[in-house]
């Protein structure tokens, strides 16, 4: 792979040697399981005529990546193996975005990779769910997959980074009595040699799990790059443990559960680094601006509202630039998105920012909002209702999703509810963009228009 020998890690060997019909892998991010899925399915398709495998991913891009990996693995097999008995490099029959197949008909073996859909029905095949905990309607798809493995030696494999202590992935991973048929693999970051200081890898395999505290573990065994990744979570310990330590987040105090968040995540929506200037809106556009307080970051969120009452997040951007640079960026973003409403956190430093926006951005509906417990409670409860009824969606933006899950509802001494999270700038930017002061945005003229 990538012109270098492909060496299997111990956890990959364990997985490939697991002959269970039902397998579950609870894993860290970026540890190479897409490659292992590709390797296992290519090997089977190469040596077993009429073999079928169906790989289900969270979106079309992820699905296409699996086929690309399978193709690369196939082409890495030396041509000399085409003449072996049996041939270990069979004829490549199909090589499309969603399918790769080997052997000539009528004994063609195929690997089909698709985004999550009911297309998993029909035919005897091996089924692989990749990032299962992040798939919308996972229970429905899981049930639809069962008939495909009923006969013969077909198998079902579920692989994912974890989310919260809820949902089918958590149930199967944690409840051995209810799902005794599953083998279970837990793979945290310290089992992946790419994330561990080379001379400490063997020690990490033996002792890292016994270290108390994620930060201490990262400092003791992690590479410099992993240190940067850990610091990038900005103190969100639960987020790091979920993404890299195969730990399920406690749902007991979460106001928004992971099940709810996943079902509102549209993984086909692009995660944009910059706003797409060619985007043509079919509704009206609002922008929420949560301004930085001391060590926090400012977050801009662009939302499209449709006539049917639905809303979807199109774009988010965080920054710690100086305020004058943030203001210049907001002006550019308003022009590019043709925003109908801009709602800014007017609390504290936001007062001057909001006044400048109203004065210097003519023709734009700018409103400032002072945060109060009452406003936050109204937004959070309205938002939860919109999530439950499917009226709001967003791309798979990790910071946004983690912060939504991090919001806790606690009761104050004054008997009011308080909504907050350890890091919540993305969340409040989202609330400002979605709801603002609650007034219906009007169609406005735009900067630069006459």
Go through each PLM region and give its residues:
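Conserved Walker A/P-loop ATP-binding site and its immediately adjacent core
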Residues: 51-72
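C-terminal nuclease/phosphodiesterase catalytic domains that cleave nucleic-acid phosphodiester bonds
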Residues: 139, 243, 247, 251, ...
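Pre-P-loop entry segment of helicase/translocase ATPase cores
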Residues: 1-22
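ASCE P-loop NTPase helicase motor core
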Residues: 88, 136-224, 353-360, 365-368
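Inter-Walker segment of RecA-like/P-loop motor cores
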Residues: 68-125
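Walker A/P-loop
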Residues: 20-41
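ATPase catalytic-site recognition across NTP-hydrolyzing enzymes
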Residues: 194-289
């Amino acid at each position: 792979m990538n012109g270098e020998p492909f060496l299997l890690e111990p956890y990959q060997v364990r997985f490939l040697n697991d002959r269970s019909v039902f397998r579950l892998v609870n894993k860290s991010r970026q540890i190479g399981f897409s490659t292992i899925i590709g390797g296992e399915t290519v090997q089977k398709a190469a040596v077993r005529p009429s073999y079928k495998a169906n790989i289900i991913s969270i979106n079309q891009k992820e699905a296409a990546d699996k086929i690309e990996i399978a193709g690369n693995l196939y082409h890495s097999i030396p041509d000399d193996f085409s003449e072996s008995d049996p041939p270990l490099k069979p004829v490549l029959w199909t090589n499309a975005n969603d399918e790769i197949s080997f052997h000539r008909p009528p004994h063609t073996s195929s690997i089909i990779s698709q985004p999550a859909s009911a297309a998993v029905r029909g035919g005897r095949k091996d089924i692989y769910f990749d990032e299962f905990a992040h798939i919308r309607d996972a229970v429905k798809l899981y049930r639809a997959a069962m008939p495909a493995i009923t006969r013969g030696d077909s198998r079902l494999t579920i692989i994912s980074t974890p989310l919260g202590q809820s949902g089918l992935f958590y149930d199967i991973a944690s409840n051995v009595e209810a799902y005794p048929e599953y083998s279970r693999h837990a793979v945290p970051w310290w089992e992946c040699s790419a994330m561990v200081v080379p001379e400490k890898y063997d020690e990490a395999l033996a002792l890292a799990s016994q270290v108390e505290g994620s930060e201490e573990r990262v400092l003791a065994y992690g590479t410099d790059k992993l240190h940067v990744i850990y610091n990038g979570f900005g103190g969100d310990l639960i987020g790091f443990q979920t993404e890299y330590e195969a730990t399920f987040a406690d749902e007991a105090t979460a106001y928004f559960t992971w099940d709810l968040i996943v079902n509102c995540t549209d993984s086909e929506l692009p995660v944009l680094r910059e706003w797409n200037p060619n985007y043509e809106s079919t509704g009206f556009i609002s922008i929420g601006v949560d301004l930085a307080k001391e060590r926090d970051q400012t977050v801009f969120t662009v939302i499209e509202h449709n006539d049917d009452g639905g809303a979807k997040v199109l774009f988010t951007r965080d920054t710690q630039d100086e305020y004058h640079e943030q203001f210049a960026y907001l002006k550019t973003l308003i022009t590019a998105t043709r925003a109908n409403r801009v709602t800014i956190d007017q609390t504290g430093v936001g007062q001057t920012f909001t006044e400048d926006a109203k004065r210097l951005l003519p023709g734009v509906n700018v409103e400032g909002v002072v945060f109060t417990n009452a406003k936050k409670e109204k937004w959070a409860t309205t938002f939860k209702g919109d999530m439950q009824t499917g009226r709001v969606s967003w791309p798979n933006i990790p910071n946004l999703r983690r912060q939504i899950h991090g919001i806790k509802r606690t009761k104050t001494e004054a008997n009011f509810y308080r909504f907050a999270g350890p890091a919540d700038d993305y969340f409040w930017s989202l609330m400002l963009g979605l709801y603002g002061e609650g007034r219906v945005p009007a169609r406005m003229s735009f900067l630069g228009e006459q």
